[in-house]
Amino acid sequence: MSLSALLNNDDPVEDTKLYLESLNREMDRLIKRDQLELMYQDWKFANYQEFELISEWNTQCKELVGDGNDLQNNDLMTEEVHLDDLYDNIQRIRNEWKDYESYKETRSQLLSKSIQAKPIKHRRRRRTKLEMEAAANLAALSQMGTTDVKTPEIINDHGNRSKASRSDTTNKTDNTMAGINSPTSDVDSGHKDELDQTKLIKKQEASSSTNSAASVTASVANGIVEDQKDEAERTIEANRIGSNMQNSDQDTMDDLKKTNDPSSDIDSDANTSVNDGSDENLSNKLDSDDLHSEPADNEEEPVSSDAEKDQAENINQTDESEEEIIVKEYDDNNDEDFAPEIKKPKPNGKIVTINSDRPKIVRELIKLRNKGKAPKSSKRRYTAVNITEYSPTEKKISVKITLKQMHVKKLKKILQDARKAEEKRLQEEAKQIADQESPRKRRKIDRSENTKQEDEDDKEDDDLDGLPTYGMKMSLKDAKAIQRHYDNTYTMIWKDMARKDCMKISRLVQQIQSTRALNYKKTSSLCAREARKWQTRNFKQVKDFQTRARKGIREMANFWKKNEREERDLKKKAEREALELAKKEEEEKESKRQAKKLNFLLTQTELYSHFIGRKIKTSALEGNEVAEEDEDNYDLTTTAPNKNDFHAIDFDNENDEQLKLKAAQNASNALAETRAKAKAFDDAHRQQQSTESDDEEEMNFQNPTSLGEITIEQPKMLACTLKEYQLKGLNWLANLYDQGINGILADEMGLGKTVQSISVLAHLAEHHNIWGPFLVVTPASTLHNWVNEISKFVPQFKILPYWGSANDRKVLRKFWDRKNLRYSEKSPFHVMITSYQMVVADASYLQKMKWQYMILDEAQAIKSSQSSRWKNLLSFHCRNRLLLTGTPIQNNMQELWALLHFIMPSLFDSHDEFNEWFSRDIESHAEGNSSLNQQQLRRLHMILKPFMLRRIKKNVQSELGDKIEIDVMCDLTQRQTKLYQVLKSQMSSNYDAIENAAAEGSDIAGGGNSDQSIINAVMQFRKVCNHPDLFERADINSPFSFTSFGKTSSLISSSIATSGGLTETISELMYSSTNPINCAIPKLIYEDLILPNYNNSIDIMEKLLLSDFSIYDPVNNKEMCQYLGLLTGLAYGSFRKIHKSNYFERIINLKKESKQSSQNLITVVSNANDLIADSIVHADTNLPNLTGIRNDIYHNDYLNSIQPGYCPKVVAPPINFNVNGSLNFTNKMSSYLFNPVITTALSSIPPPTQYNMFVKKCIPIEEFPISEMYPNPLNKHFSSNISMPSMDRFITESAKLKKLDELLVELKKNDHRVLIYFQMTKMMDLMEEYLTYRQYNHIRLDGSSKLEDRRDLVHDWQTNPEIFIFLLSTRAGGLGINLTAADTVIFYDSDWNPTIDSQAMDRAHRLGQTKQVTVYRLLVRGTIEERMRDRAKQKEQVQQVVMEGKTKDTNIQTTHTRPEHEQLTPKSLSSEPEATNNLITVKN
């Protein structure tokens, strides 16, 4: 290798390493296949061991059979019987197997006869041709010299023959020998003629060359085998070849050694390998045939001679000796080594069983033992492998393989045997042909015919599907066999190479590499030594120079890298700064453009509003006098109207003056369009009724400056007196109508917006003779209120209530007059009142009418610009629109824009612009995120003033009482806390989103884009705060009654009521319920067994209790009986008699005696008749009431609080017993249960019976039978097994209800009347149960109440002071109704929208209210309700900013829960100490 290669580190060994790695991968693959082969051999060996065990068992069975005599001698007959059965079964199975073998043999014979490829005539023609060629060849043998033998043809022929010999291994020898002569008649000469021909061929063989004779024989044999495909003939040929395998010829091996053609070596080796396998199979077949064949027809065809038997034995010995050397080869598809699942070869014709001869069994076991041994593959088929050429660069290796000659040894013997047999046969056939056909001419004719037929046959045989024929004439089967043998040999060579020579080649390559590397090292060391010679002189200088050079190169590289990086960063920075600067300039430019756009729109709107407001003087009407602006505003009357397209204006180039002029032109144009619209509406009517124009006052649209000077008095037809501020509102509304402008009357709730709007309608009818048509749209809850108010204040108006069913509305539409734009006093109607629902339903009809004035009460119903209400009402044809609302802003500024766009679509046409002007700043300020821009707020008020009028109560109404708002904070109870925590844990990941949703409140309630699941979750949390029973109510518990109830109790009761006295049916009712189980006792058992024992036990017990242990027995207690006799005047032994009487009768008699004694005492004092009557009266009424006060308190406060601790699951009366056929038992049971004295004493006497006894029969009351002695239960809870839920527990389980219970007690005590608002109707149901329990008088109004019922409920509340509580739904009962009879408002749960609650509380705090109104709001601390309340305060602040122009502190008192012993009262709520920092604000 050159020095430059070493210095450049060129490694030529790299390619070698890659090649070796590929060889190693191939070796790993082969090793895995070898392991698989070893596993398969182990598996086979295990099977052979199992076979040995079975054979041993068979041997033991034979011994057992041989010992049968001993068993008989020992008289063990039972075991012999069992063995005989076993032998019979074995014999039966053996017979079945023999039948199956005979069936197989018959089937194989039929198949062999059916397989004949060519007809007999064709075979005869071909045989004639071959005989003539053989005769010509034999004649030339004597003249020809030594020629080469074409070994591959003979080998191929032999391979075909050997394969043919293997094809019939299951037929018997006698059958194969008998089938030799079956194909043709030429073989009938017998076996002796064949021996003679063999001797003749041997003599001729001495004078000819062995190689040429073999060649001729091979060619002839190839043709003969092709002609004779009979199975029996191939079997004989295979036996002959196998018998001569030991006599191999060395000359043939020498000829094979001299051949240099590698292909011939490979072919011969492949054929030899196949022949080895065929010889081994052939030897096994011969061995099995010798063991199992039976001679048949010995005279005609003997099986074999002695010499052939000896040769067969030698063949077997040779096969056994060479078994370890020869390795079986198959094709890859049938390779046993690599295909363990391959099928085993079919067994021989006869099977060795346990009944076979001992030598056969031994021989079979030896075969099995030999088969069990793993074949040794250490011997290979070639002598050596040498590497002739190895090129690492081309990845190529050349190997020279030297084959062993042991294969040729067998081949030579096979060739000799085949040659001898064929020569003998050909001579015989040639001789016969010569004798039969002597004429030469005829032979030539036949030859020509045969030649033509042969040419046709050759053409047929040439097509072998592209397989190699090696120049021979062979069949497709032989060609396939040759190709397979070639492939097997080639594959086996590579297998042996992979198994044996890979490691050796690998070691050789490694040795070459190590040698080469060593040479490289030596060379490099020599080069280094030579190089050091001239470096040693200045080594240090060179070393320093190299170090400095490396350092300089490194520093230079770092410098340039740093320089490039800095330049790149500077360039990026400059580009970024330029981009940011351009972006900033563009943003500034765009912001200026947007500012100019907004300023243009604002200026346009301000000019319009300022002009209208100056004429209408809204500020003066509101009571807020504002100084005149110094700003020079354009006069819209002198400014020429012009429509300037907003998008066509160049805001970049126009200056402020030009933009302001264009804004004034647009404002003037909007004013002109508004006037033109109103004028067109009036002109249409003027053209229609020109005759009435003189009587009407004309609207002055040409001189609008005089509109502000108009002062309107109260209409005379208005049947009420307007207050001063209401009269100002009337002037403002009339000016708006004259100007043709729509407006919003936004006075605070309770200031009379309804009466002001009615007064405008009266003003139009009285001064302008405009009687309609007027349209009033209100919520459903205020429809009757509007009808009552209009009919009350303006009786001249004809009202058309437009609601009801579809048919009713269809009838009402007949009163419409669509021809006249203005109605007169004689028109069918003047004012039509309907609801928002009816407007949406009948929008198509209402849009066809032209309305003079449309009033929308509670205009927050159209706060959403996306709703169908807003869109339908906007499309109505109206001269003027008036919106009545106490809360123009409820949630955000978008709702205000919806109202402004509804009244002035030309000015407020874009919500995005309005949002850009005001919404962002005001809403963010309300949330506390930014400061408020006062300039923006001033401009907003300037825009809103002309269109909206709003007065608050404290400015216009001094006589109205105060309003106090109090937030009552409660803590969750134990059950509520658990429920809240469970819900919170289930939604832990989304709890923050739920709280935010609760804060967004009305946006969700209004049907926003929030997730419905979050809304449901918020409602669940609110339910927990209200009451836990909203989820699940406590059940009523009662035991299962296993009872049969009486079905005629009603009839019995009626009979009692109609009877004149006591009847026996009274007692029957007590036992009307019986047990379904009836037990019947046999009479004999009852009388002979049960009754005597019972009587004896009763007698013994009575004797012990009444005699032996009794204190009233004179024998036991003589002294006490004497004293008692002296005191009572009874005889000495009377006490024992009394003591033995019935216990219940003694109790009844005792009560009679005590009653008589008290009566006697009273008779002594005064007149008997008077005193008895008085005592009875007083004893029944006054005296128990006075003397039983302590008992009542004891029962009410203590005993009623006691509840059963256990409720049985099942109750049942006693089982019914009766004795079959025993009247005595029935009578005793009836007398015991239905004793009239006892039953009458325990039960009560019915009132009709008492009346008959006292009045008709004149029985004194003191002589009435004793009754009602059955003891009363402890309290109401023990009177029945039915357990009702405790109302006390129902109250204490809710924190809100518990505080409400305390509050209502104080409110009831101080004669307050209460409105309670709810959000959930189900909570209202629970509240009704509570009020019923506390016996509070109440009424209820919710969304399910009908319109007629709502009117009656409101009337009852206003007129009946006995009603303490009015339960209302916030949405249904918070709009448009007057409930001034109440002075206390309680919000059990708050609404999403704070304005809804404000409207609800103003139902009481409004005109007509003379008392102070107190508002309580129940809230639960630490829950979603707190977040909702905080958000509501933010919304209220937005309203205050927009409406009043400033923010004010909302001081609402917040009270906390108190200890249990301290009650919550209104007085305590209003007198909280200042130390708590909770302020209370009085709102007017």
Curated annotation (Swiss-Prot):
Record-annotated DBINO domain positions: 493-618
Subcellular location: Nucleus
SUPFAM superfamilies for the chain: P-loop containing nucleoside triphosphate hydrolases
Domain-level remarks: The DBINO region is involved in binding to DNA.
Start-end of Acidic residues biased regions: 454-465
PANTHER family: CHROMATIN-REMODELING ATPASE INO80, HELICASE SRCAP-RELATED
EC id: 3.6.4.-
GO annotation, cellular component aspect: chromosome, centromeric region; chromosome, telomeric region; Ino80 complex
Assembly description: Component of the INO80 chromatin-remodeling complex.
Matching CDD domains: DEXQc_INO80 (cd18002), SF2_C_SNF (cd18793)
Biased composition (Basic and acidic residues): 155-171, 286-295, 426-439, 674-686
Positions of the Helicase C-terminal domain: 1299-1463
Motif (DEAQ box): 857-860
Family, per entry: Belongs to the SNF2/RAD54 helicase family.
Enzyme class: hydrolase
Region (Disordered): 149-193, 237-353, 426-466, 673-702, 1446-1484
Polar residues biased stretches: 172-187, 241-250, 261-285, 1465-1484
Record-level GO BP terms: CENP-A containing chromatin assembly; DNA repair; positive regulation of transcription by RNA polymerase II; regulation of TOR signaling; subtelomeric heterochromatin formation; telomere maintenance via recombination; transcription by RNA polymerase II
Listed name of the protein: Chromatin-remodeling ATPase INO80
GO molecular function terms attached to this record: ATP binding; ATP hydrolysis activity; ATP-dependent chromatin remodeler activity; DNA binding; histone binding
Species assigned in the record: Candida glabrata (strain ATCC 2001 / BCRC 20586 / JCM 3761 / NBRC 0622 / NRRL Y-65 / CBS 138) (Yeast)
Segments forming a coiled coil: 404-462
Residue numbers binding ATP: D747, E748, M749, G750, L751, G752, K753, T754
Residue span(s) of domain Helicase ATP-binding: 734-906
